Regions:
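Nuclease catalytic cores that cleave nucleic-acid phosphodiester bonds
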Residues: 2-179
Length: 179
């Protein structure tokens, strides 16, 4: 089974994850989505209850609900810690949080940013170093501002990256139903 973890509090592509996951589940890929946040986040009711009423006959949504909400404590990094503790090879993590991405990549998970950028074992070290440098420069007042605004192109890149990750993991044998 493929497990997708969404670092959901500020994630702009939650709806895209639901659509892609539902499409792959209807094709027989065994997967589960965990929407992890510090406060309750709305998710499509039909995906939480075990599948939409118009789902193809025989679609099991991995034996139950396709999407599960997880509300963690309000403390700093609670959602990150919950995800990092569970992420492993065969899982996909959706996050823009570079330290969380680093922890999940080290655990063997596929990690994708909402703009479609893949974090890999080869790239995460430099990405983390750049993030830490920029954080230091911002703290010193040398740099103001933040990342570029989220654009439609970012959404398209994310959709392609997520679809590719699910296909790659399915081909590696992770998308098969267990039991």
């Amino acid at each position: 089974m493929i497990t997708l973890y969404i670092d959901a509090d500020a994630c702009p592509v939650k709806q895209e994850v639901y659509r892609v996951a539902e499409r792959h589940a209807e094709k027989g890929t065994a997967l589960k989505v965990f929407v992890v946040s510090n406060s309750p986040i709305a998710v499509p009711r039909d995906l939480v209850s075990g599948g939409p009423p118009d789902a193809k006959p025989g679609t099991t949504f991995a034996g139950g609900p396709l999407v599960e909400r997880v509300v963690v404590g309000a403390g700093m990094d609670e959602a990150d810690n919950w995800i990092a503790k569970r992420a492993r090879a065969g899982d996909i993590v959706v996050t823009a949080d570079v330290p969380l991405a680093s922890r999940c990549v080290k655990a063997g998970a596929e990690v994708i940013a909402p703009n479609g950028k893949r974090f890999t074992a080869d790239s995460i070290g430099m990405t983390l170093a750049t993030r830490n440098l920029m954080d230091s420069l911002r703290s010193a007042g040398a740099i103001t501002g933040g990342p570029k605004p989220f654009a439609p192109r970012d959404r398209s890149s994310f959709l392609a990256a997520l679809d590719q990750a699910i296909v790659r993991l399915t081909r590696a044998g992770f998308g098969k139903a267990t039991g």
